[in-house]
């Protein structure tokens, strides 16, 4: 059985690695804004994302935070201001 989770990935990495992290995450998730991605992943894809990020970042200098939810329905997403990456969301 394939388990699907909804994830939000936020990162603060050295400028030398920002583009590599962004390019890597775009293969799996939707870009929301600078240093923030979200989307649905299988458990296997989530493990691939974590392994790939570990290969890119320097854990002594960088930080990546992964929020994991059972589904996109597990939380409410509200956007204030101009939406950069995803379309069709409610703007408050």
Curated annotation (Swiss-Prot):
Keywords: Antiviral defense, Endonuclease, Hydrolase, Magnesium, Metal-binding, Nuclease. CRISPR (clustered regularly interspaced short palindromic repeat), is an adaptive immune system that provides protection against mobile genetic elements (viruses, transposable elements and conjugative plasmids). CRISPR clusters contain sequences complementary to antecedent mobile elements and target invading nucleic acids. CRISPR clusters are transcribed and processed into CRISPR RNA (crRNA). Functions as a ssRNA-specific endoribonuclease. Involved in the integration of spacer DNA into the CRISPR cassette. It comes from Archaeoglobus fulgidus (strain ATCC 49558 / DSM 4304 / JCM 9628 / NBRC 100126 / VC-16). Its cofactor is Mg(2+). PANTHER family: CRISPR-ASSOCIATED ENDORIBONUCLEASE CAS2. Homodimer, forms a heterotetramer with a Cas1 homodimer. Its EC number is 3.1.-.-. Mg(2+) binds at residue 12. Belongs to the CRISPR-associated endoribonuclease Cas2 protein family. This is CRISPR-associated endoribonuclease Cas2 2. One of its GO terms (biological process) is defense response to virus. InterPro entries: CRISPR_associated_Cas2 (IPR021127), Virulence_VapD/CRISPR_Cas2 (IPR019199). One of its GO terms (molecular function) is metal ion binding.
